[in-house]
Amino acid sequence: MAKEIKFSEEARRAMLRGVDALADAVKVTLGPKGRNVVLEKKFGSPLITNDGVTIAKEIELEDAFENMGAKLVAEVASKTNDVAGDGTTTATVLAQAMIREGLKNVTAGANPVGVRKGMEQAVAVAIENLKEISKPIEGKESIAQVAAISAADEEVGSLIAEAMERVGNDGVITIEESKGFTTELEVVEGMQFDRGYASPYMVTDSDKMEAVLDNPYILITDKKITNIQEILPVLEQVVQQGKPLLLIAEDVEGEALATLVVNKLRGTFNAVAVKAPGFGDRRKAMLEDIAVLTGGEVITEDLGLDLKSTQIAQLGRASKVVVTKENTTIVEGAGETDKISARVTQIRAQVEETTSEFDREKLQERLAKLAGGVAVIKVGAATETELKERKLRIEDALNSTRAAVEEGIVSGGGTALVNVYNKVAAVEAEGDAQTGINIVLRALEEPIRQIAHNAGLEGSVIVERLKNEEIGVGFNAATGEWVNMIEKGIVDPTKVTRSALQNAASVAAMFLTTEAVVADKPEENGGGAGMPDMGGMGGMGGMM
């Protein structure tokens, strides 16, 4: 395919049009008085959102050169979202400001490489100072404030804070769609895995269709059990103790399953069989997790252990087990605390080492089941359109809160970026590097300008006053008052602000040093020239 090439000024101008198209669509959502953007969907109702990265991903421009500019800024939003999970609109606003200012200077004759050096120098100083003014997050109230600011909803803030408090730092919090109108929190205590009973005849509560075992023994094996003789010796030992049995195996079927069911119905003893969770190597690891949690052993031929010679001391214990059609929950396993801690440390190390996002997610789930817990925020709304928008906001708020726990918080509402302005302005450089520093200085003001603009106010006046205020005092665009931002709970996670600034500067510097842009030449549509006249096809019948 033929290519089209544009050089220097012409190339950068075309890409800038794309940058502006995307950034102008995204930045209307910034701040407490930001608006929403409606995205058309090929199927179903349109999506209404104020999430920067969601909007950025939807934008495709007809002109190939403009589209490249738009995609560069979408990359800023996407990268910030990957690292910090929020702050995508701020990152987009910063990138647009740096690109615009930079382009003015490069057009006026500044050397892009010198400009880039100055920008990198200024951003490094800004980030260092952001870390200095950052405060660690303390207590449930602070967590609720961060989440409430991100989601623009206090109820969501307290839900997320409660979820984080109940499952701890190692816990997993997931967000699901609810069938009702209300948003609620559901916390699963203990270890839960997605395998239910092998037979509905094993239930102990026919109203709820669940089997509840109090103080059961737990037999854990990776073998398939079809013959009752294999587990008869250990069954007899359990019956003598008068306790129920949870049997976790690759599968339980045939005569073995029938015998367990018949004995349950007769009231001889109570046993529930479930399939082992996971597959392959992950199954072995999860069975080992259950064994550590319950203080039992995995009966596997890999370790030279045989079901027939299993002793009751090799079984796990728990205070309670609840088995439904789809899930098994083990509450208060009797495993030794130091062994559980060692297992948790081992899984944490694997989380750090893995490069696969899927593996990391699965390892964190295992970690949560052992050390924390699993919380599910069920999002409810009156319509599907509102539900999608609300779910996106809550996901952002959750990511924002995690980022705050990790690196602390700074004053929100664009205040922190202006707070570091004077420190960056004190940096001195020569020639084009100084121009680069000035570009970053102008960009630091842009988020607060945009927040003010979206609230119908004049940004320049607010920026000038903010530069002279003491650190931490900022402008609350929701009420129009000057307040101590952290005291009022108007905060941003340091990680979000830092990532937005770093990623914006990185892409802006790449943009300014671009000298040629290559794109596919659009094909000219020749109307009906695609197929030749097929009029003579009728004679093909004679080919038979």
Curated annotation (Swiss-Prot):
<dbReference type="GO" id="GO:0051085">
    <property type="term" value="P:chaperone cofactor-dependent protein refolding"/>
</dbReference>
<feature type="binding site">
    <location>
        <position position="492"/>
    </location>
    <ligand>
        <name>ATP</name>
    </ligand>
</feature>
<keyword id="KW-0413">Isomerase</keyword>
<dbReference type="Pfam" id="PF00118">
    <property type="entry name" value="Cpn60_TCP1"/>
</dbReference>
<dbReference type="GO" id="GO:0005576">
    <property type="term" value="C:extracellular region"/>
</dbReference>
<dbReference type="InterPro" id="IPR018370">
    <property type="entry name" value="Chaperonin_Cpn60_CS"/>
</dbReference>
<feature type="binding site">
    <location>
        <begin position="29"/>
        <end position="32"/>
    </location>
    <ligand>
        <name>ATP</name>
    </ligand>
</feature>
<keyword id="KW-0964">Secreted</keyword>
<keyword id="KW-0963">Cytoplasm</keyword>
<dbReference type="GO" id="GO:0140662">
    <property type="term" value="F:ATP-dependent protein folding chaperone"/>
</dbReference>
<dbReference type="GO" id="GO:0042026">
    <property type="term" value="P:protein refolding"/>
</dbReference>
<keyword id="KW-0547">Nucleotide-binding</keyword>
<keyword id="KW-0346">Stress response</keyword>
<dbReference type="GO" id="GO:0051082">
    <property type="term" value="F:unfolded protein binding"/>
</dbReference>
<dbReference type="InterPro" id="IPR027409">
    <property type="entry name" value="GroEL-like_apical_dom_sf"/>
</dbReference>
<comment type="function">
    <text>Together with its co-chaperonin GroES, plays an essential role in assisting protein folding. The GroEL-GroES system forms a nano-cage that allows encapsulation of the non-native substrate proteins and provides a physical environment optimized to promote and accelerate protein folding.</text>
</comment>
<dbReference type="InterPro" id="IPR002423">
    <property type="entry name" value="Cpn60/GroEL/TCP-1"/>
</dbReference>
<dbReference type="InterPro" id="IPR027410">
    <property type="entry name" value="TCP-1-like_intermed_sf"/>
</dbReference>
<keyword id="KW-0143">Chaperone</keyword>
<feature type="binding site">
    <location>
        <begin position="476"/>
        <end position="478"/>
    </location>
    <ligand>
        <name>ATP</name>
    </ligand>
</feature>
<dbReference type="GO" id="GO:0005524">
    <property type="term" value="F:ATP binding"/>
</dbReference>
<comment type="subunit">
    <text>Forms a cylinder of 14 subunits composed of two heptameric rings stacked back-to-back. Interacts with the co-chaperonin GroES.</text>
</comment>
<comment type="similarity">
    <text>Belongs to the chaperonin (HSP60) family.</text>
</comment>
<keyword id="KW-0067">ATP-binding</keyword>
<feature type="binding site">
    <location>
        <position position="413"/>
    </location>
    <ligand>
        <name>ATP</name>
    </ligand>
</feature>
<dbReference type="GO" id="GO:1990220">
    <property type="term" value="C:GroEL-GroES complex"/>
</dbReference>
<feature type="binding site">
    <location>
        <begin position="86"/>
        <end position="90"/>
    </location>
    <ligand>
        <name>ATP</name>
    </ligand>
</feature>
<dbReference type="InterPro" id="IPR027413">
    <property type="entry name" value="GROEL-like_equatorial_sf"/>
</dbReference>
<dbReference type="GO" id="GO:0016853">
    <property type="term" value="F:isomerase activity"/>
</dbReference>
<protein>
    <recommendedName>
        <fullName>Chaperonin GroEL</fullName>
        <ecNumber>5.6.1.7</ecNumber>
    </recommendedName>
</protein>
<dbReference type="GO" id="GO:0009408">
    <property type="term" value="P:response to heat"/>
</dbReference>
<dbReference type="InterPro" id="IPR001844">
    <property type="entry name" value="Cpn60/GroEL"/>
</dbReference>
